[in-house]
Amino acid sequence: GSIAASDLSAAMVQEAERRAGELGVKPGQISFLASDLESLEGRYDTVICLDVFIHYPQQPAEEMVRHLAAMAERHLIVSFAPYTPLLALLKGIGQLFPGPSKTTRAYTLREDGIVAAAAAAGFKPVRRSLNQAPFYFSRLIAFERG
């Protein structure tokens, strides 16, 4: 099989290539591409999209899930910052203060919308986990076609 990896940032793609080389990955085993998600195309056994949806509001994120699912033959794995009422409240309070933004620009997403978008493309969730770090948490969902 083959592996394709992409990132919007050409610098991140170069860093990924460098690190892959340090890990013993031979040139050509992974194809690296600097691209936005909207431009990606092809067919893959598994499509993985991690820590990207913080840049997408709900509706565009759901559209992107459908786009990624259209490229996935069997598996789709995504992560996103889940919507919580407390975080929404804190973000709203931060927007009340004048001057440079005191609020995060990261979008939080409703899980039911992400699951519905994947379901519309023929995928069902088979595993869910919550990844927690001191100042960040994300929901990871693995989907299978069928």
How would you name each of these model-derived features?
Residues 1-42, 59-67, 77-146:
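Class I (Rossmann-like) S-adenosyl-L-methionine-dependent methyltransferase catalytic domain
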Residues 45, 74:
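Conserved acidic residues
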Residues 48-49:
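A conserved beta-strand element that flanks and buttresses the S-adenosyl-L-methionine
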Residues 52:
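Hydrophobic adenine-recognition pocket in adenosine-nucleotide-binding enzymes
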Residues 56-57, 72-73:
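Helix-to-beta-strand junctions that scaffold the AdoMet/dcAdoMet cofactor pocket
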